[in-house]
């Protein structure tokens, strides 16, 4: 673990953005998530780590109701964002996903121009009143994704023609274009080379100035580099949650220590 650069920052005073209480998830008869209780702070990067199949991605998808799209999946318990129960029947999942953006494992740009990839969400949600406002929103989103300088002269080119790392940053720009408050990232660097990974990791650190960022990662080194809080999942349970530096250097639960040191996983 000596090769890890542990980022430890004071986030204790930050407000709670997301709260989960007694959350359980079932896929048919399979009990995938078991009584998860956690509070995720605002403008903080929170990493979910754990072995494959531990439930970290399943729980991540609960935070913007992506599991609603799976017929056999049912979610129990209570999840709130800014105190609002996101599973309340009055909540529109489409509007929720504008507020809680998501970036997936593999870059998935739409088969549209770079401009139209970013403009898609604002058009759907009516966030721009005219072309000038939309142009400004697209530019600001690409700037936030650290991509503007690379694409500003070819906004009409296909998004699929960009490199893998650029495509993932385009997907991040597309996510922030709907003016979300939370960004969920499910293994966002797993398909990228080391240089592109470093660019996205630097971007994640910048994004937390404006958003709550929750990232699922199999890389403990990545979790240590980018996050201030870390949650360790194992067999559907949230085993331990705390400051990233503490989780990696002085965990309380033996299962966490076993995972960090490579004895389980």
UniProtKB/Swiss-Prot annotation:
Disulfide bonds: none annotated. The keyword Electron transport does not apply. One of its GO terms (cellular component) is plasma membrane. Transmembrane segments: none annotated. Residues 18-260 form the ABC transporter domain. Part of the ABC transporter complex PstSACB involved in phosphate import. Responsible for energy coupling to the transport system. The complex is composed of two ATP-binding proteins (PstB), two transmembrane proteins (PstC and PstA) and a solute-binding protein (PstS). Belongs to the ABC transporter superfamily. Phosphate importer (TC 3.A.1.7) family. This is Phosphate import ATP-binding protein PstB. It comes from Roseobacter denitrificans (strain ATCC 33942 / OCh 114).
